[in-house]
């Protein structure tokens, strides 16, 4: 698995330490093991997890600004745990409403000794942002409209951003953004060995 990860990182032009690579592989091992009992992801092959979960998450890292992030609807920790591993100077709150997912996140935190994540079991609407976050991240969570509606209380008013990971660019969602947010940036992401388009949509509170 290490050779596959090295090849993917080289293809993406991403440089991380051996320790970070080992942590990413440990995370995939744990996800694969727990997935058999808890059904945390539809991806069953660890090699595919490297592409569709690890690489698909960490290609976003250069586009994040700030130190405090919240990953809403994180599921088994995606993209929050891979991002926390490659961005150790930042802190990631991992929010999910399902107990089995949060139990998995806490076990990952314990076994990988990740000090820069905080798993939380809560509905996003009920979670207080005190203080507000630099970035609100979502991957396969909801439409842009729902994300903004449910998460509007989470980012800092002037400096905070919404980061939505999408496949094909959702032009219909972009054309009907609610009042109070502005489109800041659209980034076409390149994920080695992953078929289909990937985009990062960055929105800012107005």
From Swiss-Prot:
Q: What is its EC number?
A: 2.1.1.170
Keywords per UniProt: Cytoplasm, Methyltransferase, rRNA processing, S-adenosyl-L-methionine, Transferase
Molecular function GO terms recorded: rRNA (guanine-N7-)-methyltransferase activity
Q: Which domain of life is it from?
A: Bacteria
Residues that hold S-adenosyl-L-methionine according to the record: 73, 78, 124-125, 139
User: Would I find S-adenosyl-L-methionine among this entry's keywords?
Assistant: yes
Which Gene3D superfamilies does the UniProt record give? Vaccinia Virus protein VP39
* InterPro entries the record matches: rRNA_ssu_MeTfrase_G, SAM-dependent_MTases_sf
List the GO cellular component terms: cytosol
NCBIfam families, alphabetized: rsmG_gidB
Q: What is this protein for, i.e. what is its function?
A: Specifically methylates the N7 position of guanine in position 527 of 16S rRNA.
Protein name according to UniProt: Ribosomal RNA small subunit methyltransferase G
The lineage, from the top, is: Bacteria, Pseudomonadati, Pseudomonadota, Gammaproteobacteria, Enterobacterales
